[in-house]
Structures are given as structure tokens and as C-alpha cells.
């Protein structure tokens, strides 16, 4: 661990322990323990838990005896138990020790999540390898990646330069909020390799409730790899602070986020055969295409979503929630997000030599064809900001879980600012492009019965920038129960008509310049999934039709495809369990009608085989196994450092290589630990040494990785 990392570690640890100390004191004041030897106190506590999960406290007199209700008026101090009154959460959620959710920035809803305390996928330390069949990547932690599953690839149109870092970043749309009956802290650290080439990740999260309905959380994550190849280093750091109140009538979710990216760009190996030939004895000696290119990006944002409810049926003191009452809500959402980026290099640092297998130089080339501004060096900067205001109304006819649960309607105003240097700015001065967009949207959702629920959303841009853009999304679930075990059939339909990204239309830098006038692109999505949790079965069919699709072609610049492109996918997840033996399979089949526009592997798979057992029952759980990823050969997307964008290269195919990790994971009470031999397959397959996930970017070499996660909830 470097001195800088240690310094950050010490400061973060000090803050966390200080918060834990304060939280422990606050918890002691709010949640006194019940004497388990007193049956009267136990009975009262159990009854109060039935009525309200947060009611469990019995007032005691000076002798330690419980004060009954009739005597409380004479007590010197009376503690009023405040319940969790929110209409967002039902009784089953309220009774959880910890639960987590994400606030919807369009409507008065939240989306529930899972608290990470289990062994499941704990050893998968690369964030981009967790979902289904994983991502194609540049081989290091803190580097860019793009999903092999086309239907998960980022498809936004705001600051697309950082799409390759989607799995790391905290945004207002995915910032998490926690409710905890006790203060909750997670501290996790992982490392691998020699200090010179080490990979490290550090995660610290603290969440605490001030009252049962009010809480805050702090999150800090950093992912860092020094790399084993020349000029290979990546680092992503993110921070978020959130606060919420989910009261009986008023709710608010607010927070700030910050993300920073620093990436040394080496452009990949000069020649793929360098990886397997004996000409170079070590990875550090292999020539790379660039030796001084650097990308840096920084993001700062804040958000606040609030709503006030007006019940149309009188509420009583015994009613904890408005969820089952006729009511309407008036709400407001505001967010601000700014990204800034800088790319730098030199002509000398981007020039490389081509050699034969004896080491003789046969050619000299530069990574870039064009040097528009300066023939010797690049220093490209640009920025984008978005200020969003939304005002919405939500109608709740009679019950949030009813046939017509809620109907939302709102209007929004987005203010965009784009900043980049152009040659004409030498004459006119630095200029900022500003756009305003005005739109309306609606949302409806309900639950016909325990067998059927549905949801629909529509947004239409009325005027200004991106006028005429349409976004429609509808989904539903059907439930069938066999011996109380659910079988879930889900469907989703989506349609989008949208203006291409500002940066696909206008871009100026030392290496790339374009001004386009692309038409609106359209996308139609259809998904059908069948899930049988008791059998470990998940089957999904996906179909996407792309019209006027904007993509980055073989020359790494944006183009628009006039014809319709279709992408079809079939996903299967089947988990088998035989006692402690688990055999988990994830397989994805995909087909694109035009591989030069949308390139996907025909088959991609992730297999996880492990044995799980408890050496000490209910105290120590151990998991030993292997994870493997594989995909068939295809023309994987290339990565362009100057634009931070993926493009459809047609030079080299990658794939047909099994990437395998072997690991041991254990959970002892509140601590999880793991030891992993990463890329264990490096020397197992003599014919598969050309191990690439992206063209010219080899996987990291085999190394031993270890780490731990410790959570505190007291």
C-alpha cells in the first residue's frame, strides 16, 4: 500500500470510527435493551413489535422495573416511540434489520435493493464481471469495459465519454439510501500482486438513522491498478453522501456525488504475437503503442427529490402510513451534474516501432493519423453540465398496492451546457453552447392481485433542444404459485426516439474533428423472461430493433446507419444444488444482422462451480470453487483513448479463451475473507495463450489476490 493510500486509509478509518462512536451513543439513547428475564417486559415488547416494528422499548423506573401505561403520566421522563411511518415500505420491509433503496428522480417512488453481506459473488472483485456473462475490458481494475451482453450496454446521450466506467460510478440515479435499526458500517479492502504492479480496492460505507424515518449515509470507493505492462495504470474514486426523511406525509431524498477517473493510456500491445513469443521475457518489457497518453475526468453532482402528501381520508394517530388511503402528493426533483475531461499526449509518446520476430525494426508508426491543432502535443479539454428541474403530482386512488396503485404526471426543464475549445475560439474567445429542453411525462403502476402487476412510463419532449424525443417503457409480471413457490413470467416493451448525443454531432480535438447533422435514432425493445427461483432457473428472450442507429465505425468516428439493424438474444441461467455442491451456469446467445454496426459474440458464458459448507454451524461458512468466463471469437469493439469511446474495429478477432479464477471464501460472523488465484488459466491451455478481452489489450497475468469485508451493526 502506497504512502498516499495509507494516508487516505487512516483518515477514512478515523472518520468511520468517530461516526461509529457517535452512532453507538445515539443508538443507546434510542433503543434500550429489554430484560430477557422479565416476562412482562417481553410480552409488552412482542405486542409492540406486532403493531409497529420500531416500538419495542419499555420505560423503566428508578429500580429497573417496567412502568405500565397508566403510570407513565407520573414518570419524570416519558420517551415517545417514533414509528417508521413511510408509505414507501410495507410491514415486511419495516421489520428488516437493514434495508436499502434508490429514489426515483421522476416520480414519488423508490426501488428496493439488497444489502451486501452474503458470500454470493463476494470474490468477484471486478465490478464489471458481476452481471450475467461479464464485460470485455482492458485487463485491469479501474479500467474501461463494455458488456458482452448488448442489451446491457450503456445507451445514454449525456457525456458518453465515461460510458466505459459505468460499473464504478455513483450517480443520482443509483445512489443508495439505507434504513437501519442500528448504525451500519462496512469496511472492505482487497489487494493483489507485488507493490509495483498491485491492484487495490477500498470501500467504506457508514449508514445511520437519526430517527426511524430519517437517516444518512456516507460512501467512499476507490479502485486502483498499477498494471504490469508499460504505461498501464487506472484509478477510479467515487464518493457519495446522502440523507433522507420518509415521514407519514413528507419525504425527501438528497445527496451529493463525486467521481474521479485517471487512466494511463498505452493503446495496447504493438503486436499480438508479443504476448506468446519468447522475444520478450517479461510483460513489463513488451512494447506498447503509447507511453505518455493520459485521460482524466471529474464529476460533481447533487440531487434532491421531495414530495408532500395530502390524505383525502382523515388519518388517526394509530395509522402509521398513508399507503392504503386515498391521497395525492405534490413533488419536486432537482439535480445538477457536471463532468469535465482532459486528454493529453505527445507525438513522441504516441510513436511506436514495428519489429520482426528477431527484434529488427521494419516500420515506425504513430497511433493517430491527424494532429489538427499541434503537431507535437495534445491537451484536449471539454466539459458538460446538466441542471434538471421537475415538478410532479401523484394520485393514489385508494391503495398503493391496488389495481390502480398510483398515477404520476409531471413537467420538466433540462438546461444543458457544453464546453470545448475550437480553432475559431482564438478569434471569438472561449464559448459555451447552451440548450434548454422542456418535456412532460406520466407514470402508472398497479397490482391487479398477487398474480399480476404492471407499470408504464412515457416521456415526450415538448419544445427546445431534443424536441420530439419520445421515451416509452412498459413492463408487467405474472405470478403462479406451486406449493407457495413462485413462477414469474415477465414482459417488457420499450420504444425510444431520441436526438443523438451532442458529442456525436459536434467534436473538436487535436486528433479528431467532426460536425454531423444526424437524424433522430429510434430503438424498439422487447423482453420476455421466465424465472423459477426454487429451481434456480432464469430464461430470457431479448429483441432490439435499431433505426438510424448512430455508432462509431472502423475509423473510430461516428456514423449513422440508415437501414434497420436487429439484435436478438437468448439468456439462460440454471443453478443446480446437490447438498453443498453448487453448479451455476449463465449462458447468452446473441445474433446481430449487421456485425459492422453492432458486434456481439455468438456465445458467451459464465460458469461458477463451488462447494459450500459450515465447519462451525451458524458461525463459520466456507466456499471453495472456480469461476470461468468464455466467449466465442468475434470482432470485439476497439477502444480509442483520444475519445474514450468504443468503436467497431474489423482488424482482429478475440475470444475462444477460458478465463478462470480459483478461490476460497469464508464468512465468520460479520467478517468475509477471500483468497483467489486470479487468471489461473494463464498457463493451463497451451493453445490459448493469446488471452485478449479487447483487441491488443491482454488480460492481467496470473496473480494471488486476497481481501476482506467487515461490517458493524452495533
Range-by-range predicted roles:
Residues 5, 11-12, 285-287, 351, ...:
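Terminal non-domain segments
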Residues 1-39, 676, 701-702, 707-714:
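Bacterial Sec-dependent N-terminal signal peptides
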Residues 29-300, 309-323, 479-481, 485-486, ...:
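Membrane-proximal, glycine/serine-rich, low-complexity loop/turn segments characteristic
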Residues 21, 52-53, 64, 359, ...:
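Short, flexible coil/linker elements and helix-boundary hinge sites characteristic
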Residues 2, 8, 30, 87-88, ...:
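Intrinsic disorder/low-structure terminal segments
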Residues 16, 21-24, 194, 226-230, ...:
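A generic structural signal for short coil/turn motifs at secondary-structure boundaries
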Residues 180-182, 292-349, 355-714:
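Exposed, low-structure sequence patches enriched in small/polar residues
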Amino acid at each position: 500500500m502506497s504512502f498516499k493510500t495509507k494516508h487516505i486509509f487512516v483518515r477514512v478509518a478515523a472518520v468511520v470510527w468517530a461516526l461509529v462512536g457517535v452512532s453507538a451513543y445515539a443508538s443507546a439513547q434510542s433503543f434500550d435493551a429489554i430484560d430477557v428475564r422479565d416476562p412482562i417486559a417481553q410480552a409488552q415488547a412482542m405486542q409492540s413489535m406486532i403493531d409497529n416494528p420500531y416500538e419495542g422499548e419499555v420505560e423503566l423506573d428508578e429500580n429497573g422495573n417496567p412502568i405500565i401505561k397508566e403510570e407513565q403520566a407520573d414518570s419524570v421522563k416519558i420517551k415517545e416511540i417514533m414509528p417508521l411511518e413511510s408509505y414507501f415500505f410495507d410491514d415486511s420491509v419495516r421489520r428488516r434489520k437493514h434495508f436499502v433503496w434508490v429514489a426515483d428522480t421522476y416520480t414519488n417512488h423508490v426501488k428496493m435493493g439488497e444489502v451486501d453481506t452474503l458470500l454470493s459473488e463476494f470474490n468477484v472483485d471486478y465490478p464489471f464481471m458481476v452481471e450475467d456473462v461479464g464485460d470485455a475490458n482492458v485487463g485491469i481494475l479501474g479500467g474501461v469495459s463494455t458488456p458482452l451482453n448488448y442489451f446491457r450496454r450503456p445507451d445514454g446521450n449525456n457525456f458518453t465519454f465515461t460510458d466505459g466506467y459505468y460499473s464504478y460510478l455513483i450517480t443520482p440515479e443509483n445512489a443508495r439510501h439505507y434504513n437501519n435499526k442500528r448504525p451500519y458500517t462496512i469496511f472492505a479492502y482487497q489487494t493483489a500482486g507485488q507493490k509495483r504492479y498491485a491492484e487495490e480496492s477500498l470501500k467504506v460505507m457508514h449508514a445511520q438513522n437519526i430517527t426511524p424515518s430519517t437517516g444518512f449515509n456516507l460512501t467512499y470507493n476507490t479502485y486502483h491498478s498499477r498494471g504490469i505492462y508499460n504505461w498501464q495504470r487506472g484509478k477510479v474514486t467515487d464518493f457519495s453522501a446522502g440523507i433522507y426523511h420518509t415521514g407519514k406525509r413528507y419525504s425527501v431524498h438528497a445527496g451529493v456525488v463525486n467521481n474521479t477517473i485517471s487512466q494511463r493510456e498505452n493503446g495496447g500491445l504493438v503486436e499480438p504475437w508479443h504476448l506468446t513469443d519468447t522475444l520478450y521475457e517479461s510483460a513489463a518489457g513488451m512494447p506498447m503503442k503509447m507511453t505518455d497518453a493520459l485521460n482524466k475526468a471529474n464529476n460533481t453532482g447533487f440531487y434532491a427529490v421531495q414530495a408532500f402528501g395530502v390524505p383525502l381520508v382523515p388519518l388517526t394517530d394509530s395509522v402509521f402510513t398513508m399507503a392504503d388511503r386515498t391521497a395525492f402528493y405534490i413533488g419536486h426533483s432537482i439535480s445538477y451534474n457536471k463532468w469535465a475531461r482532459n486528454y493529453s499526449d505527445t507525438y513522441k509518446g504516441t510513436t511506436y516501432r514495428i519489429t520482426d520476430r528477431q527484434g529488427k525494426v521494419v516500420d515506425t508508426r504513430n497511433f493517430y493519423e491527424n494532429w489538427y491543432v499541434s503537431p507535437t502535443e495534445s491537451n484536449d479539454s471539454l466539459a458538460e453540465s446538466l441542471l434538471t428541474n421537475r415538478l410532479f403530482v401523484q394520485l393514489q386512488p385508494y391503495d398503493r398496492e391496488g389495481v390502480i396503485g398510483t398515477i404520476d404526471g409531471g413537467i420538466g426543464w433540462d438546461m444543458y451546457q457544453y464546453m470545448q475549445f475550437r480553432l475559431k475560439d482564438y478569434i471569438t474567445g472561449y464559448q459555451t453552447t447552451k440548450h434548454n429542453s422542456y418535456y412532460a411525462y406520466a407514470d402508472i403502476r398497479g397490482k391487479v392481485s398477487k398474480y399480476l402487476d404492471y407499470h408504464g412510463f412515457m416521456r415526450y419532449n415538448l419544445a427546445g433542444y431534443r424536441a420530439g424525443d419520445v421515451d416509452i417503457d412498459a413492463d408487467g409480471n405474472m405470478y403462479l404459485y406451486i406449493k407457495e413457490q413462485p413462477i414469474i413470467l415477465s414482459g417488457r416493451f420499450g420504444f425510444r426516439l431520441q436526438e443523438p448525443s451532442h458529442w456525436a454531432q459536434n467534436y473538436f480535438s487535436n486528433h479528431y474533428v467532426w460536425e454531423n447533422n444526424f437524424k433522430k435514432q429510434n430503438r424498439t425493445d422487447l423482453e420476455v423472461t421466465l424465472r423459477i427461483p426454487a429451481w434456480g432457473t432464469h430464461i430470457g428472450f431479448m429483441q432490439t430493433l435499431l433505426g438510424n442507429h448512430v455508432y462509431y465505425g472502423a475509423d473510430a468516428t461516428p456514423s449513422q446507419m440508415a437501414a434497420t439493424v436487429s439484435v436478438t438474444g437468448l439468456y439462460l441461467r440454471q443453478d443446480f444444488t446437490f447438498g453443498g455442491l453448487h453448479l451455476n451456469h449463465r449462458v447468452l446467445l446473441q445474433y446481430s444482422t449487421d456485425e459492422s454496426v453492432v458486434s456481439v459474440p455468438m456465445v458467451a458464458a459464465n460458469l461458477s462451480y463451488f462447494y459450500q459448507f459450515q465447519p462451525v454451524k451458524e458461525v463459520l461458512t466456507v466456499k471453495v470453487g472456480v469461476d470461468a468466463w468464455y466467449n466465442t471469437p468475434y470482432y470485439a469493439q476497439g477502444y480509442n483513448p483520444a475519445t474514450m469511446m468504443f468503436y467497431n474495429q474489423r482488424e482482429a478477432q478475440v475470444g475462444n479463451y477460458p478465463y478462470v479464477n480459483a478461490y476460497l471464501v469464508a464468512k465468520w460472523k460479520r467478517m468475509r475473507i477471500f483468497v483467489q488465484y486470479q487468471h489461473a488459466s494463464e498457463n493451463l491451455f497451451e493453445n490459448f495463450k493469446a488471452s485478449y478481452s479487447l483487441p491488443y489489450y491482454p488480460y492481467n497475468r496470473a496473480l494471488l489476490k486476497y481481501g476482506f469485508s467487515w461490517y458493524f451493526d452495533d
